[in-house]
Amino acid sequence: MTRKNQRQQPKPGRVSRRVFLRAAPLSSLLAPLALRPPNRIYASSSRPDDIRIDDVSCDYEEYRYRAPYKFGGREVDRTTLLNVRCIVRTASGRSAHGFGSMTMGNVWAFPSQQMSYDKTLGAMKALAEQIRKITADFREPGHPIDINVWLEPEYLKAADEISRRLDLEETIPKLCTLVTASPVDAALHDAFGKIHGVSSYQTYGRDFMAYDLSHYLGPLFKGEHLDEYLLTEPKRRLALYHSVGASDSIENSDIRQRINDGLPESLREWIRYNGLTHLKIKLDGNDLAWDLERMVHIDRVTREVQQELGVKEWVYSLDFNERCPNVTYLVDFLHYVKERTPAGFEMIQYIEQPTARDLEKHRENTMHEAAKLRPVVIDESLTSLDRLMLAREMGYTGAALKACKGQSPTLLIAAAAQKYRMFLCVQDLTCPGASLVHSVGLAAHIPGVTAVEANAREYVPSANKPWESRFPGIFRVKDGMMSTADLNRPGLGAVE
């Protein structure tokens, strides 16, 4: 995409009250999200610290995986990164550049049985251009969170329009729109921190934000501010969650043909190489016997290696990528695991969303029974605050937070989830480079999160190469831990 040279001022009131009302959360426990006429939202709350957007530009990077990553019944062998740069300015004339990057992850964000990989990726690129233009044309001053809240309905409208224009067999889903918009949102947060010379995580209190959390999350949050649910200084260390894809080799004997690129090629080798203590296990969800044998096999090999290394504590998370037909499948699986390997069962820390992402359509898939055994976290369905409330109603006890859903939405959901005492974890979307720095930064600043997933190092290490010397504590993992103490640079910290 090209940089925009000339822009027109948006027409007064171009976002109607009807559009805003359609964007309101469904739950009566949540307040409407900035349901005010656009010409009053910022006029009534404009502050000297607010930013105006001068420019937004985008470009792409393409990478091939060193080995395929299988999840949700599909194998992924490539990735496209969307990089976003912005220029912002304060009323006093100060300016700053911001940067955001995210893998487009169309197989996960826009799964389709009817459209090809290239077609869904093309739709996301078309949407990215519209989101870039919408954001670049926005002229009101504000905090990045308020700008995102105000523009999200426009992004969703653009997704619908592109779906019609491209005559897509399926409409671009909201999750896909969030992923596509996430590097734009990140760039604004990055620029906002830089223009004030502080970490972005020090800009979420009353000194920089016009509203308390009740404005976004409802009356239960009256008088509370976002920074009360965040750490202004990062944790010093985080455990690394290593993904074990459904087609990954467990033993060296499983390797069909060596890659010979100097990196590990089996789980046994990876545990030794990085000193891993946290494993995310991808399962099928539609083959109980296979899932059970896979789990038992991984647990046996992990136990053997950890005993050799003298490691006594490690944990697993389980991810069925929505493929379980019902909660009975999950409960049966957990009981069988407990029978076959009681010690392995005790190592299970949490379970990611096991059934279909459309919660409204599948209200029968409640998680109450499974959640009695282990925390069950909402993931693919978690696209808004009302989805969080519905997930709680259906028995989910945790929330998966992801930078790929946007810095603004993720921080607000993290606050709400903490209020409701939900289990929290931070996962990635095979995020390399700056997107991983962003993701790790989230995990390092959210209370209660002790680990972060980072699997680009396994599947697309070439995209990490330029970043290894700049952030060795993140990209060169030792003893299963990342060093995160220096994630307090201005902005989001990835690019100066």
Locate each region found by the language model.
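Metal- or metallocofactor-binding catalytic centers and their adjacent structured scaffolds
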Residues: 96-207
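Flexible C-terminal active-site loop/helix
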Residues: 429-496
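Active-site mouth loops of central-metabolism enzymes
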Residues: 241-264
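N-terminal secretory signal peptides and thylakoid transit peptides that target proteins
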Residues: 5-28
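Catalytic core of soluble alpha/beta enzymes
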Residues: 281-430, 435-436
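Short, acidic/polar
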Residues: 256-271, 383-390
